[in-house]
Amino acid sequence: MEDHPPKPSIPTADASLSNHGRGGPSLDARFAYFCKTGLSLNENTYTEAMKLFSESKHLLSTTISAIGTGTPEEAERYWFAFVLYSVKRLSEANADDSSQGTGGDGFTLCQILRVAKLNIVDFFKELPQFIVKAGPILSNQYGTDWEKRLEAKELQANFVHLSLLSKYYKRAFREFFLTSDAKVGEQSTAAIASGYVSDYHRFGWLLFLALRTHAFSRFKDLVTCTNGLVAILAILIIHIPVRVRNFNLHDSPRFVMKGSKGVDLLASLCNIYETSEDELRKTMEKANDLIEDILKKNRRSASECRSENLENIATDGLIYFEDLLDDTSLPSSLNILGKDYADATRNKGELDERVFVNEEDSLLGPGSLSGGAMNISGAKRKIDSIASPARTITSPLAPYCSPSASHAKAIPCGSNSKMAATPVTTAMTTAKWLRTIISPLPPKPSPELERFLSSCDSDVTTDVIRRANIILEAIFPSSGLGEECITGGLQCTSLMDSIWAEQRRLEALKLYYRVLQAMCTAEAQILHANNLTSLLTNERFHRCMLACSAELVLATHKTATMLFPAVLERTGITAFDLSKMIGVSFRLKESLPRELKRHLNSLEERLLESMVWEKGSSMYNSLTVARPALSAETNRLCLLAEPMPSLDAIAMHMNITCGSLPCLPSLQKNEILLGQNGDIQSPKRLCTEYRSVLVERNSFTSPVKDRLLTFNTPKSKLPPPALQSAFASPTRPNPGAGGETCAETAINVFFSKIVKLGAFRINGMVERLQLSQEIREIIFRLFQQILSQRTTLFFNRHIDQIILCCFYGVAKISQLSLTFKEIISTIESNPQCKPQVFRSVFVDWSSARRHGKTGQEHVDIITFYNEIFIPAVKPLLVELAPVGTAQKNRNSETINGTDGQCPGSPKISPFPSLPDMSPKKVSAIHNVYVSPLRSSKMDALISNGSKSYYACVGESTHAYQSLSKDLTAINNRLNGNRKLRGTLNFDEVDVGLVSDTLVANSLWLQNGSCASSSGAPVKSERLDS
């Protein structure tokens, strides 16, 4: 199926890489052998590849330890693959050029990796090292737009999506069909164990790839592709011989009956897989067209056919192909589909997606991309198990059944009614919310919203509508048939693209109007007035809302071609602007599906940890007002954000290209492909819900005033302050902040969020490293002091880089036997860790005052620690040294920092009280939450009187028998007849459920309240009388 190139014996490198006169082939000779013998490149491509290799090979010797396992031979193979992948993607001759035919230039990424003996997962994990090091060379050779043309993050997102979809398809196929074509009623155990893939399974996947290639065009989002797979599944059910079925239409509870006509196949699949019946029918029609065009099969209306396959199936609207999967035609159909795919993708340099039909293929790799750019999987989860493992896709988020199913006689679902959540099922559930709740809304302001818009000093309705249309057209550009428009990873090449963009644009528009109305209502209640002129005439506020709405739509569909932060570029705002809006959105997030709440949580964290600190962030514009002492360094590094492009400028660009928007000058130039550390950015990093505590404090309240620290219960929560100050001019006084400017309020709130985020990460590392609470306090105080007194250390850097250096610095002054390697290994053991953060740290040598070094570059974390971090923070470290080592360290040489104490900086606070983890609701109908209990809190929490209500790992309430018996005993105590204080009856369905929002708020209040105490036992509310 897949083209397998010859596998020559590539000469290997020794530790010297270049073999200086040792008799072995040189580095250049090994690369030439790789190109000529391994991939059979023609002369032009070989010359171009050798040029890029020659200009970048000097970087290889300095990067060996940071690539793979750190061996020269392996690093060399990676570098060869990186160079050839870049040449393939960036060469002008490869840009949609079919003139190459089947020549030597038609090599694919999979062929490169086979010759290099690498797998896809490892390739994408290590690619950022090459990108950040060779970026200037690629820019010189291929132009400044090389990052967009390389499309590394899009290709990686596509790989993750296909990994998820292939597993989803495999599970679905095995639910309906036997894994081997046996005439017996049992599946072949040996076939399942060996990973055997039947020809029917293979045919379905190849037909799906044809659908992706010819019908979905550029927009291959996860939801659309899942609809495609379900459509393929319907075609297989109709055409695969009955002897291979793993179900019975009469007995299976999975199917919906359509009166006396039989099973309504499409309605049944929609119920099982949460798809739209309308979309499913449209996708099936496209697939049928492809069967006709590619396989040259003749279609017939299923109602006119008499086939065993169609018995007991309602055939209305279904198409049947007589000999589609007959034993005689199946082999030729497989060959035709394989050749069609190869011809369509030969010159694109992308993945050969046929490898996913066989999970045993060595190219796929043993791991996942959980810690890299496309972080769809989360901590402790593989690539196919996003979301809470115990959560099902039933209530409260599962929408109602499809219209046709609601009028049919439905058979109650069996095992499929509670399907374990996976990334695909979660995406489909979220998409159904968007389809059933948001899509029916009108694409214009509601009468209530219009009242707010017309109540301003002058009616702003027209301005709001015009702005929304222009910005959303910029994010989801339309394009005429045959036109091509590349915008931040978005390429419109067909009518399908225009339809897709129009649908997403309407969804974002309706969501924007709905949220805007809710925000206006809340703001009017706070101000006791309907005139919101200051807010509703603020351009930045509206663009942030539009960007947030579009991002939620994109996150719902999980597009692989428009990844965050593309919405920032299209709207002209910065990461700091969006972080304010995300904070506001948490006030109104109760109606959002769980996964969109998680997306906002993870987006907030990603913005805070690095993006807000990158060059071009509007945070620096506010910082120079709030902290004038930092203006010189901010200006020297050219960190200030450029002015936001006007609506007229955006509209002008749209008119130039007849409705599509060419790339505008980017306000976040380095955010397109790379973070400031060279890591490929991801649209979704799974974030456990406890992180919502970072943003539950109102985004626009100054922590200096501590207004929100006096609340003890949700009922006593005071109304949040007005939004106007959040998006006002930085120099404008904030009337509700006691004389502060709006910039000071914004920076104080931002710093408080950074402190909270730092506390979470420090606490997690302390636990993994098994350090004492005293060390934790010292590290946390150092982190706070650096933020307030050495703020420039954060400029252009990731906060994890600062945290890691804090750990090592405190370990040194505390005389702990903790090495840098141990700290990094501990961090990298976390699946969410991005190793590039520690392998590539920004350094400006001119500010470091180091002789012989000038300019800017990215270095490893140890170099940064020695050359930049320690000279700046040594005085702070000496002050924080534990008793006994302080005096000794005071006599050491100290170097004064350049920042100094910033006026108005928040005072250093003790380590905050943090929740162990967000409690997880284990049942939709039972009022039961599960949360881990740390041993440090066990003794304080579990008193003698309440100990029998807890089950602790490693400790039983009586002589241990078994875990199940212990849990049963506890449950019996809770639900026994004896009247116990605070007894909770989990079997009563009528008991009021505790909402997720209430739980999140209780955690927030525990962290923020001065009266809260981590050592106080948790008192349960008495629910029975």
Swiss-Prot record:
Cellular component per GO, a single term: chromatin
Tree of life domain: Eukaryota
GO molecular function ontology, one term from the record: RNA polymerase II transcription regulatory region sequence-specific DNA binding
SUPFAM superfamilies on file: Cyclin-like (SSF47954)
InterPro entries referenced in this protein's UniProt entry, alphabetically: Cyclin-like_sf, RB_A, RB_B, RB_fam, RB_N
Chief localization: nucleus
Region (Pocket): 422-875
Subcellular location(s) of the protein: Nucleus
Residue numbers spanned by region Disordered: 1-20
Region (Domain B): 745-875
Region feature Spacer, mapped onto this chain: 624-744
Gene Ontology biological process terms, A to Z: cell differentiation; negative regulation of G1/S transition of mitotic cell cycle; regulation of transcription by RNA polymerase II
Keywords assigned: Cell cycle, Nucleus, Repressor, Transcription, Transcription regulation
Gene3D superfamilies: 1.10.472.140, Cyclin-like (1.10.472.10)
Chain positions covered by the region annotation Domain A: 422-623
Keyword Chloroplast in annotation: no
Pfam families reported in the protein's UniProt record: DUF3452, RB_A, RB_B
Disulfide bonds: none
Assigned protein family: Belongs to the retinoblastoma protein (RB) family.
Function according to Swiss-Prot or TrEMBL: Regulator of biological processes that recruits a histone deacetylase to control gene transcription. May play a role in the entry into mitosis, negatively regulating the cell proliferation. Formation of stable complexes with geminiviridae replication-associated proteins may create a cellular environment which favors viral DNA replication.
Stated name of the protein: Retinoblastoma-related protein
Protein's organism: Camellia sinensis
Gene: pRB
